[in-house]
Amino acid sequence: DKTNYNKKLITSDALVWTFRNNKSVVKNPEMYGWTKLDKVGQVSRVSCKVPISDTPIKDHAITGSFSFRKAEHFLEYCDKTIFKNRRINNEFYLDIVLDECVIGGLNVQPFEVDEYNSWGTPLDLENYLKK
């Protein structure tokens, strides 16, 4: 909801939009980015294409959307990701930019959505259209 979003954004440096309890992640957890949370619910690590546990359906998977309170943070940590050449499968991913934000000490919070529809594969789209 918009109120929760605005509150979280003004109290953090960046938001990682996440979802949980979606069966699509069980079939192929290597298709997703993942966030590990600390005891107070702040993002302590972001993993790209590598699940963070043996129970991915319970973990915060990344929707692919991110919010930054300041554009400067986004640009700075994109540059750091590129400078460090942090590629996955020879490509740069925004998930890793958020991991760099965590490493850099920024306050990165999850913003969990109630529902997520994955269209990452033709089968995902076909299953969605059957709903």
Regions found by a protein language model. Give the residues of each.
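Conserved beta-loop-beta/alpha segment of the NTase-like Rossmann-fold superfamily
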Residues: D1-L37
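Catalytic-core segments of class I nucleotidyltransferases/pyrophosphorylases
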Residues: K7, Q42-N117, L123-D124, K130
